[in-house]
Design a protein with these regions (language model features):
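Nucleotide/pyrophosphate-binding catalytic subdomain
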Residues: 1-183
Length: 183
């Protein structure tokens, strides 16, 4: 079997309960499957949403905040929780993970994009599974307009992935938010 470079994107609703708390069973299953891919000789990168949802869950908030600064604070709290759990889950399968937080500016600027690519390549060389997320605690445009589907596609192109897998609870592919544009 030939070695492939695979980018897997997981959405917030896929890895959290409705309460916003992280779904440990699903996170463990994700870590196991991605570790199996890694064991088979593939290079695996994970683009993970969930920081804001995890922050809200950890803080006991019943609803996601509407104000940007509160979303950013929940992202900061949740990102720590998310990476702690990912590190714990992947270590059960003898895998090392690394965090890479990216903003739109990092991808728009040629030098910053090159630095991100170099970091990803070195992490893969060291047999580490990079976990990528938008840096929602400092981002402005992304937290309002962006999503990790776009980030995963850009990452897949940047790293020259052979395959991009989007794990979501949305049925199908859309060119706009299906909750806002139902057609």
């Amino acid at each position: 079997m030939e070695k492939r470079r695979v980018v897997v994107k997981v959405g917030s609703s896929t890895i959290t309960h409705e309460s916003g708390l992280l779904n440990l069973k699903k996170l463990d299953e994700l870590a196991r499957v991605l570790s199996d891919l890694d064991n088979a000789g593939h290079e695996v990168l994970l683009v993970s949403s969930g920081a804001i949802a995890a922050g809200c869950g950890k803080m006991g908030l019943e609803q996601k905040p509407k104000e940007l600064d509160e979303k950013q604070a929940m992202a900061a709290i949740g990102q720590c929780e998310l990476m702690y759990i990912y590190d714990k889950m992947f270590s059960q399968y003898s895998r090392k993970v690394a965090q890479l937080l990216i903003t739109k500016r990092d991808l728009d600027d040629e030098q910053l994009r090159s630095n991100a690519l170099n970091t990803l390549q070195v992490l893969l060389k060291y047999k580490t599974i990079p976990i990528i997320n938008e840096n929602d605690s400092v981002a402005i445009d992304e937290i309002v307009y962006g999503d990790n589907d776009t980030l995963s596609a850009i990452t897949a192109r940047l790293i020259r992935a052979d395959l991009l897998v989007l794990l979501s609870d949305i049925d199908g592919l859309y060119d706009a938010d299906p909750s806002k544009c139902p057609h």
